[in-house]
């Protein structure tokens, strides 16, 4: 039985590390928009999870029904958060196979 070629293994590990770093940078440079009520409330979130904008259509602002607006903002935030997680899984998932595991649960 022959020993594995350590230089080849090291080269593969370095290549995977470079791909992983590129995927991480792509995720961090990305932006997603979560929405609720067919876009009447939107939350823009960076790939790092930072909320960069919240837009609320005046049609959903009712001073007598603040709870609905709160629910819509929360729904838009959760939608944006899910989209960031989906983006991370899309970019990192194929790379995680090389590590023998699913990294999607990290995001």
Swiss-Prot record:
GO terms for cellular component: bacterial nucleoid; cytosol. It is found in: Cytoplasm, Nucleoid. InterPro entries: YbaB-like_sf, YbaB/EbfC. Belongs to the YbaB/EbfC family. Binds to DNA and alters its conformation. May be involved in regulation of gene expression, nucleoid organization and DNA protection. It comes from the Bacteria. Gene3D superfamilies: Nucleoid-associated protein YbaB-like domain (3.30.1310.10). This is Nucleoid-associated protein CE0210. GO terms for molecular function: DNA binding. It comes from Corynebacterium efficiens (strain DSM 44549 / YS-314 / AJ 12310 / JCM 11189 / NBRC 100395). Keywords: Cytoplasm, DNA-binding. Homodimer. SUPFAM superfamilies: YbaB-like. Transmembrane segments: none annotated.
């Amino acid at each position: 039985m022959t020993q594995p070629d350590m230089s080849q293994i090291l080269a593969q590990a370095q290549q995977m590390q470079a791909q992983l770093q590129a995927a991480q940078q792509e995720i961090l440079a990305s932006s997603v928009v979560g929405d609720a009520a067919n876009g009447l409330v939107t939350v823009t979130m960076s790939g790092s999870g930072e909320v960069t904008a919240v837009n609320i259509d005046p049609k959903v602002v009712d001073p007598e029904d603040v709870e609905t607006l709160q629910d819509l903002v929360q729904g838009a935030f959760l939608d944006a958060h899910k989209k960031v997680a989906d983006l991370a899984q899309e970019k990192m998932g194929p790379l995680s196979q090389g590590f023998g595991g699913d990294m999607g649960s990290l995001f």
